[in-house]
Amino acid sequence: SLANPGIRLYGAMDAKMYAEFTERLAEQTPGGPIVIALTTMEGDPEIARSMADDIRLLRDRGRREIIFLGKTAVYSAGVLFMAAFPVSHRYLTRATKLLVTENKRAQPMELAGGSLRSVASQLEHAQREIQREIDQEDEDYRAISEGSNVSIQELREKAPHDWSITASEAKAMGLIAEVV
């Protein structure tokens, strides 16, 4: 139940949280719904996507009802994880804030010296990598907005400015099923 989640996750969405998540998921008794409570203010988007994939696979292949309960803070990578759940299975506690952010490059780009053709090749590779990351971000925005009143375009426009959304605003936008 929402009052007693089977899995409680708190902290950075990192390899440690992922290990805890998979361990707790494996401990769940077969049958009924699984409620996952999450509080996170930071994290690795790739870890969040991996956790989201686990949820999708379990829901689609394992035929399990899985419910998301955001508590206090669901920032950035946490919102990516929340996107794995259909709107009808997303809940936030009253004081919870969502933070939708734009992906940032973790490392600066450096070009090795060499011939102009070599440098041009490096630039082309970097451009393809950046485009792949932009495409992934659009997929993330699509998952976040699916079933809601928020468009992908609105996410693209507001995410670069770190869009903070209260639980009641998220409900009004159709991003969640209910505020609890």
Where are these regions (language model features)?
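Terminal-region recognition feature
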Residues: S1-V180
